C-alpha cells in the first residue's frame, strides 16, 4: 500500500534568512547608466527569499517527494492525454541554440528558430488536413478563442452579421461554450442521443441563418467517435455555418483520419496533450490553430513563411484580414521545439501506432472493468482513446460517490481519473490511459477500482473517508473556491486581517 512522503514543509519565504546567498550575479563589464523613469522604479526592495543553494535544493527535493506526475505512475485524467514526456524533448529544448535565442533578434540571426516553427506547421497541416496554421495561441482555450474569433471575423467580413449563434454539444468541453461566449456568440446547446453522439434531428432543428458554426470534438468526451460526422458537416455548411474541431482528443485518430477530411474548417490542437509536451502545472502549453485556405487571411500575425527563391524564413505580417495578435510574440517556442522533436522521432508510422495503442488500452480497460458492481458504462461500448463509467449505481446503493472513488484511488498510488465530466454522465469517472501505459499498469488500475467497489458494498466508510495515506487528505473545496489564497502575499495579508486561521 502506498504511503506518500509527508514533510511539514514551510514556504521558501518562511525559510528565508537575511544575508544568506545562493547565487551572485556577475559584475557588468563596464558601468551601465540606465535612465529608468521615476514612475517605473520600485519604491521598495524586491522581496526575494534569501537562502543558500543547499537549502533551496533540499526544499524543492522535499516538495518533489510529495508530488505525483507522469513519471511517477499511471495518470489517466480523461480528456487530458497525460502521456509520458520523452526526455529527449527536454534535451533538445535546453540546447543553447534554443534556450538562449531571443524573440527580438533580427530575422537573419534566428533562421533556425523560424525553420523549426515552419517545419512544425508542415507536420500539423499534414496531420489535420488544414492549409495554414498559427502557432501563437498559448493553450487550448486560447486556441479556441482564436478559432471562434476567426469564424466571427469571417461572417462579419461577408456582411452576415446576423450569425450570432454558436452550436455546442452537451458533451463538449466546458471551455467551448466559454470561448464562444467570450467571442460574442450566443451559445446553443445540442443534446446527445442514446448512443452518446450528436442528435442529428436536434442539430437540424437548431441551425438557421443565425448559425455561425458548430464546435465539436471527435472522438467526443465519452470517447465515442461521431460516426455521422460527414452528415453533421453537411447540415452545418448547408446552413452557412462553419465547423470547428476541438483537437483535445486527436490522440485517438493520429494517422487514421484527418479533421480536414471530415469537413472541419477550423482546428485547434493541444501540443501539451497529443504531442508529448509537458502540461507543466497549468503552463506553458501551446494551442496552434489551423484553417482551410479560405480562412487563412484571418489568422493572427505574424505567420512564419518561407521564401524558396532566397532560401529564407521570415515573419509574415501580410495577413490582410487578420484578427490581430492573441499572444505576445510568436507562441511558446520551447514547447514548439519539444513537439517537433516528438514528431520527428515518432514519424508517420509511429504516430499511427500511438493512436492504435491508445485506443487498444482504453478498450482493454473498458472490457476489464465492465460489469463490476457499482460502475455503469453509458453510450456505445466501443471506445476510442478514453472511456467514461458512471458511479451512479454505487452512489444510490452505498452512498459512495465518484469523488470518494477518486480519493480512495490515491491510497493505491494511482492518480484519479477526471470526475463529474462530461456533465451528461452522472457521477462520471472519465479514464484516459494513453498509449504509454503498460498492460500491467492497466490491470493494476482495474483491480484497484474493483477493490474499491468491494469496499463500497462491504465497508463504505473506508472509501468515504479516503484518502488515508496522503500528506493532505481532503481540502475544503468550498472555502478554496470562495476565498482562494494563491500567493504568499495574499496569505500574509489575509492572515494579518484575521480572515484565515491556518
UniProtKB/Swiss-Prot annotation:
UniProt EC number: 1.4.4.2
List of residues that carry N6-(pyridoxal phosphate)lysine: 273
UniProt keyword annotation of Oxidoreductase present: yes
Pfam families associated with the record: GcvP2_C, GDC-P
Top-tier EC class: oxidoreductase
Keyword annotations from UniProtKB, A to Z: Oxidoreductase, Pyridoxal phosphate
Alphabetical list of SUPFAM superfamilies matching this protein: PLP-dependent transferases (SSF53383)
Cofactor names: pyridoxal 5'-phosphate
Catalytic activity: N(6)-[(R)-lipoyl]-L-lysyl-[glycine-cleavage complex H protein] + glycine + H(+) = N(6)-[(R)-S(8)-aminomethyldihydrolipoyl]-L-lysyl-[glycine-cleavage complex H protein] + CO2
Gene Ontology molecular function: glycine binding; glycine dehydrogenase (decarboxylating) activity; pyridoxal phosphate binding
GO cellular component: cytosol; glycine cleavage complex
Single GO BP term: glycine decarboxylation via glycine cleavage system
Family: Belongs to the GcvP family. C-terminal subunit subfamily.
Subunit comment: The glycine cleavage system is composed of four proteins: P, T, L and H. In this organism, the P 'protein' is a heterodimer of two subunits.
Alphabetical list of PANTHER family matching this protein: GLYCINE DEHYDROGENASE (DECARBOXYLATING), MITOCHONDRIAL, GLYCINE DEHYDROGENASE, DECARBOXYLATING
Function recorded in the entry: The glycine cleavage system catalyzes the degradation of glycine. The P protein binds the alpha-amino group of glycine through its pyridoxal phosphate cofactor; CO(2) is released and the remaining methylamine moiety is then transferred to the lipoamide cofactor of the H protein.
Entry protein name: Probable glycine dehydrogenase (decarboxylating) subunit 2
Organism: Thermococcus kodakarensis (strain ATCC BAA-918 / JCM 12380 / KOD1) (Pyrococcus kodakaraensis (strain KOD1))
Amino acid at each position: 500500500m502506498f504511503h506518500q512522503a509527508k514533510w511539514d514543509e514551510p514556504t521558501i519565504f518562511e525559510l528565508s534568512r537575511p544575508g544568506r546567498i545562493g547565487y551572485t550575479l556577475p559584475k557588468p563589464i563596464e558601468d551601465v547608466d540606465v535612465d529608468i523613469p521615476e514612475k517605473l522604479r520600485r519604491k521598495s526592495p524586491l522581496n526575494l527569499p534569501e537562502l543558500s543553494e543547499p537549502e533551496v535544493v533540499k526544499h524543492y527535493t522535499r516538495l518533489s517527494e510529495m508530488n505525483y506526475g507522469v513519471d511517477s505512475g499511471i495518470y489517466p485524467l480523461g480528456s487530458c492525454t497525460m502521456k509520458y514526456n520523452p526526455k529527449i524533448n527536454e534535451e533538445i529544448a535546453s540546447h543553447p541554440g534554443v534556450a538562449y535565442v531571443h524573440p527580438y533578434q533580427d530575422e537573419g540571426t534566428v533562421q533556425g528558430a523560424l525553420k523549426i516553427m515552419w517545419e512544425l506547421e508542415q507536420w500539423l497541416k499534414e496531420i489535420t488536413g488544414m492549409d495554414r496554421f498559427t502557432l501563437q495561441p498559448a493553450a487550448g482555450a486560447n486556441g479556441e478563442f482564436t478559432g471562434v474569433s476567426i469564424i466571427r471575423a469571417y461572417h462579419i467580413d461577408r456582411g452576415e452579421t446576423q450569425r450570432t449563434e454558436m452550436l455546442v454539444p452537451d458533451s463538449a468541453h466546458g471551455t467551448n461554450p466559454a470561448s464562444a461566449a467570450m467571442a460574442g456568440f450566443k451559445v446553443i446547446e445540442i443534446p446527445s442521443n442514446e448512443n452518446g453522439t450528436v442528435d442529428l434531428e436536434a442539430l437540424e432543428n437548431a441551425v438557421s441563418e443565425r448559425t455561425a458554426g458548430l464546435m465539436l470534438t471527435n472522438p467526443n468526451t465519452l470517447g465515442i467517435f461521431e460516426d455521422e460526422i460527414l452528415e453533421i458537416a453537411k447540415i452545418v455548411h448547408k446552413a452557412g455555418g462553419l465547423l470547428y474541431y476541438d483537437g483535445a482528443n486527436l490522440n485517438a485518430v493520429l494517422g487514421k483520419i484527418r479533421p480536414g477530411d471530415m469537413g472541419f474548417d477550423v482546428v485547434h490542437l493541444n501540443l501539451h496533450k497529443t504531442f508529448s509536451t509537458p502540461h507543466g502545472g497549468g503552463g506553458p502549453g501551446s494551442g496552434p490553430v489551423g484553417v482551410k485556405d479560405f480562412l487563412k487571411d484571418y489568422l493572427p500575425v505574424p505567420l512564419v513563411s518561407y521564401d524558396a527563391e532566397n532560401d529564407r524564413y521570415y515573419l509574415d505580417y501580410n495577413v490582410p484580414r487578420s484578427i490581430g495578435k492573441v499572444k505576445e510574440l510568436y507562441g511558446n517556442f520551447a514547447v514548439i521545439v519539444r513537439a517537433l522533436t516528438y514528431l520527428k522521432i515518432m514519424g508517420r508510422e509511429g504516430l499511427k501506432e500511438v493512436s492504435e495503442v491508445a485506443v487498444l488500452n482504453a478498450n482493454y480497460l473498458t472490457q476489464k472493468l465492465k460489469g463490476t458492481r457499482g460502475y455503469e458504462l453509458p453510450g456505445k461500448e466501443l471506445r476510442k482513446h478514453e472511456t467514461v463509467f458512471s458511479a451512479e449505481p454505487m452512489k444510490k446503493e452505498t452512498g459512495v460517490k465518484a469523488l470518494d472513488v477518486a480519493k480512495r484511488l490515491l491510497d493505491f498510488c494511482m492518480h484519479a481519473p477526471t470526475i463529474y465530466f462530461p456533465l451528461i454522465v452522472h457521477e462520471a469517472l472519465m479514464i484516459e490511459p494513453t498509449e504509454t501505459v503498460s498492460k500491467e499498469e492497466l490491470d493494476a488500475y482495474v483491480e484497484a477500482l474493483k477493490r474499491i467497489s468491494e469496499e463500497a458494498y462491504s465497508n463504505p466508510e473506508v472509501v468515504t473517508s479516503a484518502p488515508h495515506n496522503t500528506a493532505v487528505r481532503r481540502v475544503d473545496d468550498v472555502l478554496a473556491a470562495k476565498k482562494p489564497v494563491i500567493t504568499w502575499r495574499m496569505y500574509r495579508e489575509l492572515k494579518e486581517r484575521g480572515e484565515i486561521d491556518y
